[in-house]
Every structure is written in C-alpha cells, then in structure tokens.
Amino acid sequence: MEILEEKPKEGKVKIKVETLDDLWHLYHIITPGDVVYAKTLRKQSQRSDSLRPEKVEVIPVFLGVKVEKINFHKFANQLRVTGPIIYASREDVPLGKYHTIAVEPGTIITLQKERWKPYYIERLKEAVEASKRAKVMIVTIEDGEAEMAIVREYGLDFIATIRHNLGGKRYNIKREDEERKFFHDVAKTMKDVMSRENIQRAIVAGPGFYKEDFYKFLKENYPDLASKIVLDDTSMGGRVGIYEVIKRGTVDKVYSESRIANEIKLVEKVIERIAKDEPVAYGMKEVEEAVNYGAVEILLVLDELLKGDNREKVEELMELARSLRSKVVVVSSEHEGGEKLKALGGIAGILRFKIK
C-alpha cells in the first residue's frame, strides 16, 4: 500500500492499493458512513428514440460513494464498496443512486472519514509498513504429497495441493521416476507462485528425511530456487504441518515481523494463563472490567467484533485501553488463533495483575 496524499483537515487520504493484503487491511479500515472516491465503470441506459429499446452503455466515471456495505472477496482479489453516489464527475450520472466500487490491486482510492480514530490511523501505517516486508511461502512435503501456503497479513492462504501416486518400494526404479516427476511438479509450482507473488523466501518442512531429498533435488535442478529455501522439521505433513511451522517460530526467523505468528502466540498465551489461573480476562464483561481497572497489558480483539453491531462499544474500549498504556492487537479470524479467540468471546486481556 502506498499513501499518495493526505488532507487531514478534510479527513481524506489518497491510497494506491498494491496487494491482496492491502485489500484486507482496507476491509478493516473502511466503515459505514465513510466516503470512497475512485475511478469506476457504471452502466448507463440510453434511449435513442421511443420506438427502440434502451441501449446500455458502460461509461468510465469518477464517483464518490457513501459506504453502506463492504465485502472482501479474497479469492477474486477484490474489495467491493457499496452505497449511494454523493459525487459524480459526469452530470448525466444521478446522485443518490446506488453503486459498487470494485477495489483491486492497482486501484487508487481516496478515503474520507469524519474522524480518523487512532485504530484506523495505526492500521493504515501498519498496512504501509507491511507492504515493505518480504512475503514467505510454506511448503510441507512427504511421500508423494505437498501442501503450499502463503503467509499473508490476515492468515494463511492455502494455494495448492499436489499429490502423486509413487507406487511400491522406495528404491524401485519406477518409483524413483515418479518421485522425480513429483519433485519437478512441486518445484515448478513453487517457482510460478513465488514469481507471481514476489516471494523471496520459502520454508520447506515435513517429517523424516523426505524434505532433504527434495532439497537435494532442488540444488541439482533448480539452484536459484534452492537458494531461497529454509528447511524445518515437523511431526506431520499437510496443513497440520504448516500450522506447526507457524507455532514453532520458524516464520519469525525468516520473516522477523510475522503478524500471524505473533497473533497465534498471544492467543496461546491467553489460553495458557487460563489453564494456570494466572492474570487474564476474556469475554466482554470481564475484559471491560479489567480495562477500567487499568489492569490490561495486552488487549486482544477479534477483527469480526469491529464489523459487528457492537463496533462502537469495542472501539471505545480499545481507545480507553490505549489511553491506559495497554497494547491493542486486532486478531484475524482467518487463522486458528482467531478461531480460539472467538471461542473465548472474541476479546481477551493479558493482565498486569489479578483483579479478583
């Protein structure tokens, strides 16, 4: 994400969207009541005369839309912002009609808020910083099966599963041929994804020595790819193995500021404190009480709460926590840490001291 222009007095920020992660950040920054300005395409009906049917023309136009709905479509690489038109660069576009602006990587938008609350300013800065960090890919590999995921800002994006039937015994010639085909398939997919997504590092993990065999194959056949690989041990392959890599902290070693690893670690710390009866609070009532006591060291808030009916109450609690020197972390609902936090009511606090 790139900030092109800021107009604080008007509450406007001009933004260039660059990645899927930027769309996810914007999904949590744009709220109902905001105004989004962008170049867009709009269908316009034209009647040439009363005897002929209406002709629909698609016209390019610069619109301002007052936001009512925001939808993040990660598989379509798109954020859809819907609301009534309050500004149009063409006089033949009627104000008040509804329009959806499709925001994609490459789109330039101007976002206007009546008030930029601290959370939204922090989130915007975080998105800009995140765009400067290298992305990491995780691949788990074992006997004829590979699973691939990209570590994104919002969680893990599982992008490919490759399976080959390798046949019989390990040193059978036919099996060795099939294994080479499998390795080539995995390597080519990795190269394609890393090139397309501009990924500089990949973690290859799995149980046993199979990953070492694959790494040796890469050094002989794909040396450029091999130079970007870090190996890691896991007890299992597949998606379970990928989550194991996250929990082991390997991503942090490769990519020192992994958002997802930090969020999962903090949620696990909450669960550990609950089990050990150490200072912790979870659920809205308990956490609100802890914040009012100034007892919260780290406040964890599930991102879904900032899209729900109690959004304003949650935002006020976050602002109060910050004013009392608490660190506030918004946890993505797209990974297992978010799922666990959701089971605790979507909000939790790691406390400085017990309040009961």
UniProtKB/Swiss-Prot annotation:
GO terms for cellular component: cytoplasm. One of its GO terms (molecular function) is endonuclease activity. It is found in: Cytoplasm. Pfam families: eRF1_1, eRF1_2, eRF1_3. Its main location: cytoplasm. One of its GO terms (biological process) is nuclear-transcribed mRNA catabolic process, non-stop decay. Its cofactor is a divalent metal cation. Coiled coil: none annotated. Keywords: Cytoplasm, Endonuclease, Hydrolase, Metal-binding, Nuclease. InterPro entries: eFR1_2_sf (IPR042226), eRF1_1_Pelota (IPR005140), eRF1_2 (IPR005141), eRF1_3 (IPR005142), Pelota/DOM34_N (IPR038069), Pelota_arc (IPR023521), Ribosomal_eL30-like_sf (IPR029064), Transl-rel_pelota (IPR004405). Its EC number is 3.1.-.-. It comes from the Archaea. The N-terminal domain has the RNA-binding Sm fold. It harbors the endoribonuclease activity. Belongs to the eukaryotic release factor 1 family. Pelota subfamily. May function in recognizing stalled ribosomes, interact with stem-loop structures in stalled mRNA molecules, and effect endonucleolytic cleavage of the mRNA. May play a role in the release non-functional ribosomes and degradation of damaged mRNAs. Has endoribonuclease activity. Monomer. This is Protein pelota homolog.
